Amino acid sequence: MKDKKKIGLILMYLSFGIVMAGLGANDALRGVFSPIFKDHFTLSSVQISMIIVMSYAGNLIFLWAGTRLADRFEKKKVMMGILLIWMIALLVYVTTDNYYVLLITMLFTMGASTLMNTMINLFVPMYFAAPGLIVNTLFFVQGIGTTGSQMILGQVATGFSWWQKTNLLLFSLGLIGLILFLFAGKKAVVLKSETTDAKNDFDSASKAKPKVQMNSPILWLLVLVFGFYFIGEHGVLNWLLLYCKDQFGMDSNQASIYLSMFSGTMMIGRLVMAPLVQKWGPSRSIQIFGGIGTVLYAVGIFCGKPTLMLVGISGLFVSILYPTLLLFVQQYYPSSIASTATGTIISIATIFDIAFNLLFGKIIDQMGYHLGFMILPVSMIIFYLIVNFLIKKYKPLRKLGKN
């Protein structure tokens, strides 16, 4: 029985790892192929930006609806359904050559990708005794997918056919992950430390309608935590390159050093810091790593070009925040509504991302890059203040790891 359970956990981890690598690569494709889309379809800047907007819209819709389905029905089947949607959408990319089809399909691939990412993080605490370690190593694997695809495709992708070939490869990864997950589901066992109703939530269909109190102060504090964090992390990933070029006059090679450093330390940090996250638990880890990361990040931007290197270094500590925040949320809700609560919080917080990206261009036109970019460190500081207030004010309902 123990050997069967161990094999099940290994298969599940391999399944999650393969899928996370594919999801990481999927997330990177927009940036890599945007110039190719622009030339191939003769797109304007507005049409290119619509691809990003559709991606975030997909995140919002899928997280809002998908996590509710996950709390109503058997989570394993919901997860497989989401994975199948992602894979079918990838095949649409492979077999079509039309901007508007790409635009609509982007909603499904990116929405399903983000939801799969969240579902994997909801599964981990139910099956693995060291959720902090497992979650952060899986995000490390995702980082390999993101960074690896950027490096390789950035060198070899010269036309639209590479877009189709890449998505066919991602479909193959999804298929392998699905097969492994099917085998793992027959062997892996829910942890005994979880409640009986939690086990039923993950392994049998739930008849009770899940409810998340929308007037709960905890929910809205968590929305603010994720919302301001999204602006801080995603803002750097989306805008640092242009900031370095337009504000400091760097060429593309110089500017890319800082962005690559941030992305690289993010990937490394999730592997190196994972044992500490497991040792300290979500709350303490967020306080310690969030504090160090926020200070480095803020000083790096506030003090200008001489300290930009600190922004890159901050990725080492910022890296664990998002995966650990996903565990952190689950501590404040019963397992029977953990998926719904997580989806509600992240989907509402995604509006911060959408609003920021829609407005930031206008802000820098009016205020300039120097003042406009200050929104990012201010957002990180607000994130850290709110999450500390939440930790001190409200005790978790359950603990995932030490706190």
List the model feature ranges, each with a label.
Residues I61-D97:
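Conserved MFS/SLC helix-loop-helix module at the cytosolic interface between two early adjacent transmembrane helices
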Residues T114-F128, I320-Y333:
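Intracellular juxtamembrane helix-capping segments at the cytosolic ends
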Residues P131, T137-V189:
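Helix-loop-helix hairpin linking two adjacent transmembrane segments in secondary transporters
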Residues W280-F328:
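C-terminal transmembrane helical hairpin of 12-TM major facilitator-type secondary transporters
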